[in-house]
Amino acid sequence: MRDQYQRKIDYVRISITDRCNLRCTYCMPGEEVDFIHHEKLLSTEEILKIVKAFEELGVTKVKITGGEPLVRKDIIELIASIKKMAGIQEVSITTNGVLLEKMIDDLEQAGLDSINISLDTLKPAQYALMTRRNQFDIVMRGIQCAIKSSIPKVKLNCVLIKEINGDEILDLVELAHQTRVHVRFIELMPIGYAKNLTPISEDEVLDLLSKHYEGVKPFEGKLGNGPAHYYEIEGFLGKVGFISAMSHRFCSTCN
């Protein structure tokens, strides 16, 4: 399948719920959130029918997102059923990690290929401030479970905000140094609830990395299906990636 710009479309993202067990300040207004009623959400059968239609159009990779996808009771069934479709090569999810510790075994058995975990800070107090929940320890345990699992790719998504975690960049990068995790920095889009916050650009981060580490160079391989691009650093087990919607336009590479 190709779009009007002749880009090959082989990847689909499906949001299976708007519900979330965190209340991140740049994402939600607070506690009073008007969620979609359950009966108006796509059912298990409807989601699988949609994925099957995309598969027939040439889509080979499926990303399951939310909200928080792990709060749906049918998430394991969905992953396992999609993995059984002959044309689907990869199924991945994006999660905040709160439920990972208790669900990692089921996710492995369902055949999950890749997992993206949102983590914007390594400071428990700052985490509580950003998410309005005290779940830092359980998320960190979930990340360790993912690292130890047989799931092939584990990535951390970090939204950089100058006022909040601008002093933690190197600490977050160290996670890719010591473990197989790929750390991805996502540029904040200062709109909506985040309009008064200050983003940190890819160039600022690269400048910091080049001053602190030797052997920082673009990674020539491919680690995912979206617009992220990666750098490898000498001695690192994981890679450092960027999704730079503000400072580096990536529309031409979107699939």
Protein language model features and the residues they cover:
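N-terminal [4Fe-4S]-dependent radical SAM core
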Residues: 1-15, 23, 56, 228-239, ...
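Canonical Radical SAM [4Fe-4S] cluster-binding loop centered on the CxxxCxxC motif
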Residues: 4-44
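A short acidic, helix-capping loop that chelates divalent metal ions and anchors anionic groups
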Residues: 32-37, 123-130, 191-196
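Radical SAM/AdoMet-radical enzyme domain recognition
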Residues: 44-64, 72-182
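Conserved G/P- and acidic residue-centered "switch" motifs that form tight phosphate/ATP-binding loops
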Residues: 68
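Glycine-rich beta-alpha junction loops
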Residues: 160-164, 189-192, 246
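Accessory C-terminal segments flanking Radical SAM cores
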Residues: 192-255
